[in-house]
Amino acid sequence: HSQQRLLREEVLSLTRQNGEYDMGKKKSKSIVAVVGRPNVGKSTLFNALAGENIAIVKDTPGITRDRIYADVSWLDRNFTLIDTGGIEPESKDIILSQMREQAQIAIDTADVIIFLVDVKQGLQDADSKVADMLRRSRKPVVLAVNKVDDFKKYMPDVYEFYNLGIGEPYPISATNRLGLGEFLDEVIAHFGQEVEEEEEDDRIRVAIIGKPNVGKSSIINRLIGENRLIVSDIAGTTRDAVDTEITHNGKEYVLIDTAGLRRKNKIKEELERYMIIRTVSAVERADIAVLIIGAVEGVTEQDAKIAGIAHDRGKAVIIAVNKWDAIEKDNQTVKEYTQKIRQVLSFMPYAEIMFISAVSGQRLMKLYDVIDAVNENHSMRVATGVLNEIVTEAVALQQPPSDKGKRLRIYYTTQVAVKPPTFVIFVNDKELMHFSYLRYLENQIRDTFGFVGTPLKFFVRERKDKK
């Protein structure tokens, strides 16, 4: 037992150093949006800050993504960086209207806004107009003056940007990564205290996500409408995903709605970007994502993009096929739909699938039961002794891989976090842990404990053989 305890402590200290998870305590992550005219270097800054952490480049199979958001860490503060930029327009009028649009998205969804300007182009009329908007929003704004690759030469030009009236301009060069430290210090200074959610907060936070026009609002209205016990619209939520508190069967839920403004004249690409930003903003604050898919259109690549946001962030996922009443059905229909969904969303085989109708109310209240079950799985802890029995049995059933005569040895497995359940497997040589064997172990653990609706995270750590 003492050896097991030592191993466990070793595992925990190793993984804490890596900061790869937060021991199951849910921290609310700040959202930082970048706004600026075309060609001031937004993408360069985005790449400089995000480094290798670009969530969008992560190879979740079956998904192509645009570089719209990324996870960034600075001085142990984690935040989600959003690039509000869109298509590069031609005329000055279009530039201004697009910048206003970007600024509005940032004001709607972000906690802190980075306003990026270009020292070489100097202060432009469009900069002043957008600065006015940002000032009125009362959101914290950090002004970054880009392309200052020679501080002595450009400092007089940097001071000109004080005229925008949004505080001190921070000189940076995104290309050469100059001045980023002080600038990032200022960004995270606006986060306030990093709030660890109170352990006693038993409310289940559910984001309702999906493409436009799949019936998200109707579903939320139904869920609220059948529950006359609406506690309140939570005050103080400044982001544009609207949170509503609900009590159902004595349990409390927070529904986070991403159903945004319908903008008829918007270009398709812009609508999609806007939808993704709103989804990131909502999913960040939820435990569970309910992905709504339209039954008539069926599952699409765009659904996969939205699902990928929840998957990358380790959220539990329920897939709800809405407008089920509008479909001609026979006894194969459910099976065919399920197969198609599993095929397009192949990266989340764990997700629960259900078929509902907001119009008729069909199976809509059952959604609460599924949310409860999935929430339980997302928060499940497995005792270390039991977990190691399962892994030992799995190893006996299927020998671990070997390379050049050296075989993988698994010493010990322990669960170190929940939401999602996170495990550390301690081995002699992590290079020997083949992806397919890890998948096999995951399947054995799932077969035993269920874990329906939630992703599982695994870290493989080395511990040199003491023999």
Question: Where are the language model's segments positioned?
Answer:
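Canonical P-loop GTPase G-domain recognition
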Residues: P140-V142, D149-E199, A326-V382
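Long, well-ordered amphipathic alpha-helical subdomains in the mid-to-C-terminal portions
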Residues: A207, Y368-M433, R439
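Cationic, low-complexity basic patches in intrinsically disordered or flexible, solvent-exposed regions
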Residues: Q4-R5, Y21
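Conserved C-terminal guanine-recognition region of P-loop GTPase G domains, centered on the G4
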Residues: E101-E168, I277-Y350
